[in-house]
């Protein structure tokens, strides 16, 4: 946590952050762009501490990136008119139950995030990390000005899985799929 003191644009989310659209093991390209590792971090609106840290980090990234945001223009656009990564799930994803009563941040990186468990031991089993788990994320915010688009973006540093959750995206777990079939072998043999 001491790194966040020296870096005002870095945030460690709370442990009740849910991961969605989790591409932590393999970089994926969107619309032919650069392949990136990414995750949508769903943050409950009740996690006021994490939301406060994210808002402060976005403001710090804005201040640090004023020259970049100004570009060739005469003035720096106000933060309120820029695209920022903290979005309201109730507004932008009203039909997705996973985003209800939550904010979300899409974080990405061209380099793979470090992934550890609750005891900070590396997770090597890819099936342990999926869309729907809960955990912390180390993220950083930075200003961008590219092809006329200006704003604040979110970089993905590392992930810490805290606990399992219901898989998102319709994927079921093998343990759940076959839970009701456990006693059927006896019928087959008799």
What is each stretch, according to the model?
Residues 146-166:
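OB-fold/S1-family single-stranded nucleic acid-binding modules
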Residues 1-104:
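OB-fold ssDNA-binding interfaces and closely related basic DNA-contact patches used
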Residues 106-124:
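Beta-strand/loop nucleic-acid-binding surfaces
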Residues 118-135, 142-152:
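Exposed beta-sheet edge/beta-hairpin loop segments within beta-rich domains
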Residues 55-60, 119-122, 170-181:
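Short intrinsically disordered coil segments
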Residues 1-9, 166-190:
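Acidic, gly/ser/pro-rich intrinsically disordered tails
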């Amino acid at each position: 946590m001491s790194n966040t003191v020296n870096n005002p644009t870095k945030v460690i989310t709370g442990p009740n952050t849910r991961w969605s659209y989790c591409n932590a093991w393999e970089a994926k390209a969107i619309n032919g762009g650069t392949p990136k590792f990414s995750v949508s971090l769903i943050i409950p609106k009740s996690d006021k501490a994490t939301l406060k840290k994210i808002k402060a980090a976005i403001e710090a990234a804005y201040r640090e990136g004023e020259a970049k945001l100004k570009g060739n223009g005469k003035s720096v656009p106000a933060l309120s008119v820029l695209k920022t990564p903290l979005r309201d799930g109730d507004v932008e994803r009203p039909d997705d139950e996973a985003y209800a009563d939550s904010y979300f941040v899409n974080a990405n990186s061209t380099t793979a995030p470090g992934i550890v468990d609750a005891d900070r031991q590396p997770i090597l089993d890819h099936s342990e990390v999926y869309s729907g788990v809960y955990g912390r994320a180390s993220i950083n915010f930075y200003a961008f000005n590219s092809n006329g688009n200006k704003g604040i973006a979110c970089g993905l540093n590392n992930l810490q899985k805290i606990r399992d959750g219901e898989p998102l995206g319709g994927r079921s777990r093998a343990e759940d799929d076959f839970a009701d079939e456990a006693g059927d072998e006896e019928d087959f043999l008799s």
